[in-house]
């Protein structure tokens, strides 16, 4: 996960002193997507482990930033027939997200 992006965002958050959430946080299950998680055109081999590892790294990096108040996970389809590479349902990343959200709920 690119910590320099968090540094860049932190400057703006501190300047304006406003709450911050990631309205869309996600990474495809395509090999190489952890380097460019916002590139939805990336083609390649499916890599569920890379997607799960990206979520672990993102949560780990963000928990060190007290100004990060939440995440909207992209993509959570309403139908499994329309499952995209960003979808986490029935993939290892789903368990990573569930564990993180459960941990956060216990610490409230």
Task: Locate predicted features.
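Active-site environment of divalent metal-dependent phosphoester hydrolases
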Residues: 28-30
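Conserved small/polar residues in nucleotide/adenosyl-binding loops
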Residues: 1-4
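Structural recognition of the beta-strand scaffold that forms the well-ordered cores
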Residues: 19-24, 69-73
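Short amphipathic alpha-helices and their capping/turn segments at secondary-structure boundaries
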Residues: 6-21, 59-64
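Aromatic-rich peripheral "rim/lid" segments of glycoside hydrolase catalytic domains that contact
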Residues: 32-57, 61-108
């Amino acid at each position: 996960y690119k910590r320099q992006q968090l540094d860049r965002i932190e400057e703006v958050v501190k300047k304006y002193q406003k709450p911050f959430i990631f309205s869309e946080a996600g990474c495809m299950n395509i090999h190489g997507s952890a380097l460019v998680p916002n590139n939805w055109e990336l083609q390649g081999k499916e890599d569920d482990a890379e997607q799960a590892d990206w979520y672990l790294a993102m949560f780990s990096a963000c928990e060190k930033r007290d100004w990060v108040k939440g995440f909207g996970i992209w993509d959570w389809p309403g139908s499994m027939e329309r499952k995209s590479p960003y979808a986490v349902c029935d993939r290892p990343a789903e368990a990573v997200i569930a564990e993180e959200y459960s941990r956060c709920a216990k610490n409230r």
